[in-house]
Amino acid sequence: MKRTFRLSPGAFWQVHKEAANLLANEVVGMAKAQGFDPQGQNYDLYGGVGLFSGALAAAFGLDLKITTVEASKTAAEDAKRNLVDIKGAKSVALPTERFLDELASHGKLKSNSTVIIDPPRSGAGRHVIDRLLELSPAHLIYVACDPIALSRDLKPLTEDGYKIQKISAFDLFPHTHHFETIVSLVK
């Protein structure tokens, strides 16, 4: 991915210099395999400074429609700056739970929707998963740094009809028990 990201002090970024590209490329590959619609209802939850939104724009063009949601106002401002050239990009500074509550009040997402979710180590949690089930996006890409939280969050999704299309794991912290997992789910 040929894109530069600016980060404020204290903003989250992967420690290894190649990790962000590795994860972004995998997310883009999964989106392509799912039949990602750049003009669909697309959301990048816990979107940080806009890594995955930027990667999707690099792959699908600057007309991409995507909303990046991030609780940290500083990171959301960074995302707004990092995605300024993407015509359909929005950056929302809200906790994901509150954003999804508002979004769910408008009914289900359209059939061309994709949601990328990259929660903190604790996972998305039941409230977010319940809202995603209510919104029923056609495609989900879940990026996780804790396999226990991931399995807890995947259980209700798969019980509700989501099928795991692909799972990829990355050892970004050699000689530790930590690894990143990316899961592609389709309904």
Enumerate the language-model features and the residues they cover.
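Rossmann-like S-adenosyl-L-methionine
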Residues: 1-187
